[in-house]
């Protein structure tokens, strides 16, 4: 239910603000979004997996906190990120 190393590296290179960037809010939110998408697919076939559902809710809350932080620090970067990820339709 986790993402592969290749997928994680792809996301990091796509959203990195500079070379070797692994900790910026953009990268963290993108990785969390990838994990959330993976878990969402998992729940389409495993509807009663409540242990993993709790983990999904924790990931969503963590992503929300990072997005709130980014919006407070730099709203322009926040808007670019949510547009790139397709969040907040």
Swiss-Prot record:
Keyword Heme attached: no
Q: Which InterPro entries match?
A: Ribosomal_uS15, Ribosomal_uS15_bac-type, uS15_NS1_RNA-bd_sf
Q: Which domain of life is it from?
A: Bacteria
SUPFAM superfamilies, from UniProt? S15/NS1 RNA-binding domain (SSF47060)
Provide a Gene Ontology MF annotation, just one. Answer: structural constituent of ribosome
What is this protein's function per UniProt? Answer: One of the primary rRNA binding proteins, it binds directly to 16S rRNA where it helps nucleate assembly of the platform of the 30S subunit by binding and bridging several RNA helices of the 16S rRNA. Forms an intersubunit bridge (bridge B4) with the 23S rRNA of the 50S subunit in the ribosome.
Could you describe the subunit structure of this protein? Part of the 30S ribosomal subunit. Forms a bridge to the 50S subunit in the 70S ribosome, contacting the 23S rRNA.
Hey, which family's this protein in?
Belongs to the universal ribosomal protein uS15 family.
Show the PANTHER family listed in the entry.
Answer: RIBOSOMAL PROTEIN S15, BACTERIAL AND ORGANELLAR, SMALL RIBOSOMAL SUBUNIT PROTEIN US15M
Protein name per Swiss-Prot or TrEMBL: Small ribosomal subunit protein uS15
Organism placement in taxonomy: Bacteria, Pseudomonadati, Pseudomonadota, Alphaproteobacteria, Rhodobacterales
Gene that produces this protein: rpsO
